[in-house]
């Protein structure tokens, strides 16, 4: 019996392709060196004289929208309408002592650093009108007049908080 040379390919070998088949070498492409020209970079040099720095003392900031003046009831309702349009679940949270991030039990960020506030009642699943949220906000303000109160928009599909802003602050803040 005559032996047949081992020319039968396995399935894995039959599907293999040589790497980079048909690519041209870099020598075929022209290379141009660009000179770094910094004369066309944007500049705000003329406007620096008009800029101001936000005073850091006595003006603590909280989170989204906190650099704006206090929002009116109608502005708050528009923000709530925005989160409802995005199909986020409104929630109210309040804090009685520390409206700012603080470190009480550890130096590193964690659960007890002032970012987690007490939730007012339950998340408002099924809420379709900003008036419902504003009514709950008024109830919370009536119950805790010296509390920081914020409104949160929670995406229950992605399980993330998408928006959070201060709705009410104690007097003097």
UniProtKB/Swiss-Prot annotation:
GO cellular component, one term: chloroplast
Pfam families assigned to the protein according to its UniProt record, in alphabetical order: RbcS, RuBisCO_small
Keyword flag Protein transport: no
Transit peptide as recorded in UniProt: 1-49
One record GO biological process: reductive pentose-phosphate cycle
UniProt key word Transferase: no
Keyword field: Calvin cycle, Carbon dioxide fixation, Chloroplast, Photorespiration, Photosynthesis, Plastid, Transit peptide
UniProt GO MF annotations: ribulose-bisphosphate carboxylase activity
Family: Belongs to the RuBisCO small chain family.
Purpose of the protein: RuBisCO catalyzes two reactions: the carboxylation of D-ribulose 1,5-bisphosphate, the primary event in carbon dioxide fixation, as well as the oxidative fragmentation of the pentose substrate. Both reactions occur simultaneously and in competition at the same active site. Although the small subunit is not catalytic it is essential for maximal activity.
Note: The basic functional RuBisCO is composed of a large chain homodimer in a 'head-to-tail' conformation. In form I RuBisCO this homodimer is arranged in a barrel-like tetramer with the small subunits forming a tetrameric 'cap' on each end of the 'barrel'.
Subunit structure: Heterohexadecamer of 8 large and 8 small subunits.
UniProt name for this protein: Ribulose bisphosphate carboxylase small subunit, chloroplastic 3
Biological source species: Flaveria pringlei
């Amino acid at each position: 019996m005559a032996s047949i040379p081992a020319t039968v390919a396995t399935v894995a070998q039959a599907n293999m392709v040589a790497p980079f088949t048909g690519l041209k070498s870099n020598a075929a492409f022209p290379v141009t060196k660009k000179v770094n020209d910094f004369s066309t970079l944007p500049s705000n040099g003329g406007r620096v004289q008009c800029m101001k720095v936000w005073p850091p003392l006595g003006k603590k900031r909280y989170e989204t929208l906190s650099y704006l003046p206090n929002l009116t009831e109608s502005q708050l309702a528009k923000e709530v309408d925005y989160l409802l349009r995005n199909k986020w679940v409104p929630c109210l949270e309040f804090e009685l002592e520390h409206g700012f991030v603080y470190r009480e039990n550890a130096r590193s960020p964690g659960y007890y650093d002032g970012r987690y506030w007490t939730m007012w009642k339950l998340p408002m699943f099924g809420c379709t009108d900003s008036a419902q949220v504003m009514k709950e906000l008024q109830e919370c303000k009536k119950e805790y007049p010296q509390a920081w109160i914020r409104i949160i928009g929670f995406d229950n599909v992605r399980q993330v908080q998408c928006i959070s802003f201060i709705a009410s602050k104690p007097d003097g803040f």
